[in-house]
Amino acid sequence: SAVYKVKLIGPEGEENEFEVQDDQFILDAAEEAGVDLPYSCRAGACSTCAGQIVKGQVDQSEGSFLEDDHFEKGFVLTCVAYPQSDCVIHTHKETELF
C-alpha cells in the first residue's frame, strides 16, 4: 500500500508531520506518532475530531456527519479519513463547522 506524509497544524500553530498508510485512518496514525488529537465517537458520526484540509486529498466516505458544503470548505473527520496524497490539515476545527 502507499504511504503519505501528513502534516497536522494545531490551534497554537504547532506542527506534527508523520507517515500514514493509505489504508490507515489519520487519527490512528497520529496517536501512533504520539500526537494528541480530539476525538469522541471514532466512527465519523460526530464532529469532535474535525479538521480542515488545506493541501491534499483524503477518502472519508465512511463518515456520516459532514454534509457536502462541509466537504467544499475542506472539513475532514480525522477518525475516518484515509490519506490519498500528502496532506496538510489544520486540527481542532469543530467550532468552525457551525
From Swiss-Prot:
[2Fe-2S] cluster binds at C41, C46, C49, C79. Keywords: 2Fe-2S, Chloroplast, Electron transport, Iron, Iron-sulfur, Metal-binding, Plastid, Transport. Binds 1 [2Fe-2S] cluster. GO terms for biological process: electron transport chain. In radish there are 4 ferredoxins: 2 are root-specific (R-B1 and R-B2), one is present in both leaves and roots (L-A), and there is a minor form which is leaf specific (L-B). Its cofactor is [2Fe-2S] cluster. It is found in: Plastid, Chloroplast. The lineage of its organism: Eukaryota, Viridiplantae, Streptophyta, Embryophyta, Tracheophyta. One of its GO terms (cellular component) is chloroplast. This is Ferredoxin, root R-B2. Ferredoxins are iron-sulfur proteins that transfer electrons in a wide variety of metabolic reactions. Belongs to the 2Fe2S plant-type ferredoxin family. Its main location: plastid. Residues 4-95 form the 2Fe-2S ferredoxin-type domain.
